[in-house]
Amino acid sequence: MNMKNKSEKEMTHFGFQNVYKDKKTSLVSNVFHTVASQYDLMNDLMSFGIHRMWKRFTIYRSEVYVGCIVLDLAGGTGDLSIQFSRLVGNTGIVVLADINDSMLHIGQKKLRDLGILNNVIYIQADAEALPFSENTFDCVAVSFGLRNFTNKEQALFSIHRVLKPRGKLLILDFGVPNFKVLHKIYDLYSFHILPKIGKCITQDINSYRYLVESIRMHPDQETLKNMIIRTGFSNVEYFNMTFGIAVLHCAYKC
């Protein structure tokens, strides 16, 4: 292998920038260290609160019940973990895992302030090398996290390994809008308004510019579906929400 091809294989995207793979993790980490304290507020402002509806639908499709063991991966500030903890009850377990300790700290504090103390475990973990045994979880959910992973396929293989047979995968993230007429409006809002909102609230325009760019670099609905199939999952389907701005992919481990 020549040096050029080797270099290309070691590269990935950080927003619209090409960076070395081993650098992306630290760059993404810096973004979320910066935005962690205002993350929930910014989600409400940027989506006009609609992200809560998307997450409710994710929970609805989860098939999680009392006694289940659930992994909320890249779970950040814990929105899904709150709902999962109620579904699994006292005999189940929710593992809230995130590679970023700032986000994990915010999530832990939020859940404890809500009185959720007994059935949620907090673990700092890399999605691409999950520190769990095979066939551990009934359900793994990734909410607005997959696009930030350095190697998405490696993360999906890792998730597949820790899911129980017939366990369910849920991936909630941004997609490509269904209607072309929405693209210009969506781009105008995303590239010109969202970063300014971020700057006003957090005094940090660059982190929110990255978040917008990461959405554009994320695989479209069909591409992600095929990636999930390639990594060993079956019965893969997806649900467009808000005209395809958000998408929930669902799949099962065979």
UniProtKB/Swiss-Prot annotation:
GO biological process: aerobic respiration; menaquinone biosynthetic process; methylation
Disulfide bridge partners, by residue number: none
Pathway linked to the protein: Quinol/quinone metabolism; menaquinone biosynthesis; menaquinol from 1,4-dihydroxy-2-naphthoate: step 2/2; Cofactor biosynthesis; ubiquinone biosynthesis
Record-annotated membrane-spanning stretches: none
Group of enzyme by EC: transferase
PROSITE patterns from the UniProt entry: SAM_MT_UBIE, UBIE_1
Keyword flag Methyltransferase: yes
Record-level Gene Ontology MF annotations: 2-methoxy-6-polyprenyl-1,4-benzoquinol methyltransferase activity; demethylmenaquinone methyltransferase activity
Pfam families: Ubie_methyltran
Keyword Methyltransferase: yes
Alphabetical UniProt keywords: Menaquinone biosynthesis, Methyltransferase, S-adenosyl-L-methionine, Transferase, Ubiquinone biosynthesis
InterPro entries: SAM-dependent_MTases_sf, UbiE/COQ5_MeTrFase, UbiE/COQ5_MeTrFase_CS
UniProt function note: Methyltransferase required for the conversion of demethylmenaquinol (DMKH2) to menaquinol (MKH2) and the conversion of 2-polyprenyl-6-methoxy-1,4-benzoquinol (DDMQH2) to 2-polyprenyl-3-methyl-6-methoxy-1,4-benzoquinol (DMQH2).
NCBIfam families assigned to the protein according to its UniProt record, in alphabetical order: MenG_MenH_UbiE (TIGR01934), PRK00216.1-1 (NF001240), PRK00216.1-5 (NF001244)
The protein's name: Ubiquinone/menaquinone biosynthesis C-methyltransferase UbiE
Source organism (scientific name): Blochmanniella pennsylvanica (strain BPEN)
Species lineage: Bacteria, Pseudomonadati, Pseudomonadota, Gammaproteobacteria, Enterobacterales
